[in-house]
C-alpha cells in the first residue's frame, strides 16, 4: 500500500542535518534536528495560543528559537477507527509560527531548551472542551467501571444519536424548503450534524485520530492539561482518579518506550459550580501513585472569572521543573511545592507535616490562609495557621477536639502556603467525608 517505516538508532542531539532517502527516486529533507520531542495534549488550556497570554506582544517578538520546532495536529476525531498520519508540518519557532501555538507547550519547551541546550520538538495536540474518555483507547476504558459502561453502550448511543440527527435535519430541511417556497430568503439552509463517531466527545475518538498516529514516533514524554470537562459532577471528578492512570498506562503501552514521564497540570483556582476540589484530589492521588508522573500545582495563578488563565508562563515553567527532575534527572532541582504528608493532633491543635518543603515553608502573605479545621461533627471552620519548626500548626477556637483539616478545598480558594523556592502547596484534605 506504499507505506513503510524506518527506525534510526539514537544519535547525539544536534543539527541541523540533511536526511536523504534513496530508492527508485530520492527524497531530501533539510534542516533536520535531533533532540527531545514532547507531546502537549489536553483541552482548551493546553490549546490556548501564545497570542492570548499576558504580555503576548513581548513574548511573540522574542520567540526566536531555531532549535525549537513546533508541530500542530489538525482537529480530527473518529471513535470507530484509527489513522496512521496527521496533517501538519514541523515549523521553526519564530514570532510568526509561535503566535497560534500552544502557550503552555511553548513556555515549557522554551524553559527546557534554556536548561538542557538540546533541540526541543513540541507536538500540539489540543481540542477545547474535550473529556478524558475521548483521549483514551477502548482497552483502557474497559479497565474503569464507568468507562466500561460507556464502551458497552456506545453502539446503541451512536446509532440513536445519528438517527436523531437525521430526524432533526429532515425536519429543518422541510421548514427551510417551505420558507423558500413562500418567498422567505432569510432562513439559512440547514447542515447535517457531525456523525457520533466523529464527535470529539465520543469515546476514544481523539486517541484514535490525534494520539495513535504518533505512537510509533520517539518521544521524551507528555505534558497534559485537561480535567475541566470531567468536573461537571462530583462522580465524574472522582472517577478521574481511575481514568487518568488508565490513560497514562495505555499510552505507555502503545508507545512501547517504557514508563516515559507524564507531566500534568493540576487545575487552578476558578470560581464556578464545578467540582474542582475533587478533581485536584484525583490528580494528586495519580501523582503520588506513579513516580514517573509530575504535577504542576497552579492553585495560585488561576483567575476568578476566566476559566482560561492568562498566566501560562508559570504553568510552562513549573512543568519544566518536573521534566528536569523526572525526565532529565538533574540534581538539586526542587520541582514541587509542599505536599501533605501526615497530621498529628496535640490537644486543640492539628500539626501538619509536608514533603517537598525545599529550603523551608513560607507564606506568600503575612499570615497563612486557606486552612479549615473540623471536629467529629464534620463542620469546618476557618482556621488560624502558622509555620512552626518546618510544620504547619492549625487551630480554631470553635473546634476543641480536631479530627480533620482541609487546605484550599474550594473552587477558588485563597491559598498562601509555599516553599522558599516559591512553589505552591497542593490543596488537600485529611478526611474522606462526602
Residue ranges and their predicted role:
Residues 1-434:
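Cell-envelope and extracellular/periplasmic
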Amino acid at each position: 500500500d506504499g507505506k513503510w517505516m524506518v527506525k534510526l538508532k539514537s544519535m547525539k542531539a544536534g543539527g541541523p542535518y540533511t536526511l536523504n532517502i534513496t530508492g527508485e527516486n530520492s527524497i531530501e529533507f533539510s534542516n533536520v534536528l535531533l533532540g527531545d520531542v514532547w507531546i502537549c495534549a489536553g483541552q482548551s488550556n493546553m490549546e490556548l495560543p501564545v497570542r492570548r497570554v499576558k504580555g503576548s506582544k513581548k513574548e511573540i517578538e522574542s520567540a526566536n528559537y531555531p532549535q525549537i520546532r513546533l508541530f500542530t495536529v489538525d482537529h480530527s476525531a473518529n471513535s470507530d477507527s484509527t489513522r496512521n498520519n496527521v496533517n501538519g508540518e514541523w515549523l521553526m519557532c519564530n514570532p510568526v509560527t509561535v503566535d497560534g501555538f500552544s502557550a503552555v507547550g511553548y513556555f515549557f519547551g522554551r524553559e527546557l531548551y534554556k536548561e538542557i541546550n538540546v533541540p526541543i520538538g513540541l507536538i500540539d495536540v489540543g481540542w477545547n472542551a474535550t473529556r478524558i474518555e475521548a483521549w483514551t483507547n477502548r482497552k483502557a476504558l474497559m479497565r474503569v467501571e464507568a468507562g466500561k459502561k460507556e464502551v458497552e453502550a456506545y453502539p446503541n448511543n451512536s446509532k440513536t444519536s445519528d438517527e436523531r440527527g437525521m430526524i432533526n435535519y429532515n425536519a429543518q430541511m422541510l421548514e427551510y424548503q417551505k420558507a423558500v417556497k413562500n418567498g422567505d430568503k432569510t432562513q439559512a439552509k440547514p447542515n447535517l450534524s457531525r456523525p457520533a463517531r466523529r464527535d470529539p466527545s465520543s469515546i476514544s475518538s481523539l486517541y484514535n485520530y490525534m494520539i495513535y498516529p504518533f505512537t510509533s514516533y520517539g518521544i521524551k514524554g507528555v505534558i497534559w492539561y485537561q480535567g475541566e470537562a470531567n468536573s461537571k459532577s462530583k462522580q465524574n471528578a472522582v472517577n478521574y482518579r481511575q481514568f487518568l492512570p488508565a490513560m497514562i498506562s495505555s499510552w505507555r503501552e502503545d508507545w512501547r518506550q517504557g514508563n516515559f514521564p507524564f507531566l500534568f497540570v493540576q487545575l487552578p483556582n476558578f470560581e464556578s459550580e464545578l467540582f474542582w476540589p475533587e478533581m485536584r484530589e484525583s490528580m494528586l492521588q495519580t501523582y503520588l501513585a506513579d513516580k514517573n508522573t509530575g504535577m504542576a500545582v497552579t492553585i495560585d495563578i488561576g483567575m476568578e472569572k476566566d476559566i482560561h488563565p492568562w498566566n501560562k508562563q508559570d504553568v510552562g515553567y513549573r512543568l519544566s521543573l518536573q521534566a528536569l527532575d523526572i525526565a532529565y534527572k538533574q540534581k538539586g532541582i526542587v520541582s514541587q511545592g509542599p505536599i501533605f504528608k501526615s497530621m498529628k493532633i496535640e490537644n486543640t491543635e492539628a500539626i501538619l507535616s509536608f514533603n517537598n518543603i525545599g529550603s523551608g515553608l513560607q507564606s506568600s502573605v503575612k499570615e497563612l490562609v486557606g486552612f479549615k479545621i473540623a471536629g467529629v461533627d464534620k463542620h469546618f471552620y476557618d482556621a488560624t495557621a502558622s509555620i512552626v519548626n518546618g510544620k504547619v500548626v492549625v487551630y480554631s477556637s470553635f473546634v476543641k477536639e480536631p479530627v480533620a483539616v482541609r487546605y484550599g478545598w474550594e473552587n477558588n480558594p485563597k491559598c498562601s502556603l509555599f516553599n522558599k523556592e516559591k512553589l505552591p502547596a497542593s490543596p488537600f484534605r485529611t478526611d474522606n467525608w462526602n
